[in-house]
Amino acid sequence: MNIILSATITNSITESMKPALLVLGLILAALVISCIVFTAILARSGGISIGKKIVLAALYVTTLTVLLCTFLCFRQYQIMEDMSATETANSPSATQTTAAQETEATTEPPTEPPTEPPTEPDPTVAPAHTEKSDPANWKVKWSIMQNGTVLDSFQRNETIDFGDASQYSALDGIVTFRGDNYRTGASFGTTDMVSQTLTKKWSAKIGSLKGANGNWTGCGWTGQPLIVRWDDETKAILGLYEEKKEKEGLVEVIYATLDGHIYFYDLEDGSYTRDPIRIGMSFKGAGSLDPRGYPLMYVGSGDSTTKSPRMYIVSLIENKVIYEQSGSDIDAYRKWYAFDSAPLVAAEADTLIWPGESGILYTIKLNTAYNPSEGTITVSPENTAKTRYKTNTGHKTGCEASSIIVGNHIYYGDNGGMFFCVDLQTMELKWAQYTRDDINATPVFEWGEDGVGYIYIGTSMEYAKGNTYIYKLNANTGEIVWERKFTDVAYNERVSGGVLSSPLLGKKGTELEGLIIYPIARTPSVSSGTIVALNTETGETVWEVVNRNYHWSSPVAVYGSDGKAHFILCDSAGKATLYNAAGEVINTLSLGSNIEASPAVFENTFVVGTRGQTIYGVSIE
């Protein structure tokens, strides 16, 4: 706008100078003519008196003065005209005619071009320990290793940067345990219930597998299925039955189970989408699909059967294992090598991140080569860097729960009650916190209204006899925001009590907003269970429900398009129960036997397996 006004003013000045220059030109011409005529007259008259000489000199001086003024004025006129041309060319209205410019300037103020509102950057964590979260408090001995050598320092070549949980996966569905890198929950889409009932839709029988100390049957803890709607391009090259490749909108259930198989079902009717993959190792954990939409599955075994526990990478094009790595690691302090946790993949860095029960945190460069047009995918993994640690707690190291990753920082807990924050760029330990007991339940992360990240953690009961704890931690400092202690947990050496279920964090904008829901097993008696809904800000109990049967299964939300919220929780008697946001029972469905596994919801259907060797698809109506 300033440019337009400046150009208009300059044009006005140059226009007003034209008459003045014309007058000066006429005066100058008259003076020149007078000088010529007067000089000629004096020359003819012979002698020139002193008085006439003075008049003639004055006439010449006046003429020269007017000539100089005329020259200066003309020069200024040229400068102003050049300025006007330049400003007009630079103005936003340069392509309009002069008349249009004058009309705009005299009728209404010019409109400034609209400006985009500044984009707020995504919130980030900036972890650093305080006096209360200093790893030295527990004498943590932290080692960064590469190729069997302890490093003084490490710097990753690739940048690891996990975005918001909503951006983790390119696929529609549930691609890892509790859905994403924040572990926000295992539900996809919305369901507007009418009758508010649960109805068996289909079932599929599975088997058992002999383990080190008995038989592993059906689906166990944590045992969540993965559910995905493949895009057409990927579906065309998958190892699916031809009729399933041709099916419009196919949604596939992928279930790694205790009987050593990975099963594949059509969510709609429970029919096989491809042959099961027999690996022969028991799978307690859910595993993960590649969030980039690549046809890869990452899954870890939980017990020694035919060989030591290990991590697997499975091609879903060829339906076979294309890479495996034993957890039997000479660098590990703990000699238990299972992989129950569900790993995460840093997409742009092409890096697999996987804490193991041996206490080793693995980061593996995959070197993935994927060619959709040719229907091929390969990996050539390199163990880039890993960490190991010791503490003075006297408890077990090793990670059984799944980790959280925010930005380039991983958060995870161990079987001894330690909880860590690690910078994945440098593998440095940023802070540590002690939670008093075994962390089996996967934690959950959320951004607070203050822009600070927070983590919710629950402990199962192994060391703190009779007690279990729930914490809210500050993700930057590692300090405890609030803590809840539950003192009526029955102790059982064979079957754990306390918090084994991963919590349900209420989604913003729904009836569950502001709540964190935890099932607590074996409380107040050895066979019963309690569900507590806590206020996320204060930790205070909002409501509490005591059930006859305990829960290892994790609650899963069912959200309506209008913000209405329910949740489903399965128990040790094989019952699936639908609750409303106030903790009131809406409907129940018996699935026959103990449900340790956690369900996953895809729109109006949930899938869960039982220890009774059956997988169910259940309609949410």
What are these regions (language model features)?
Residues 33-58:
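Cytosolic-side transmembrane helix boundary signature
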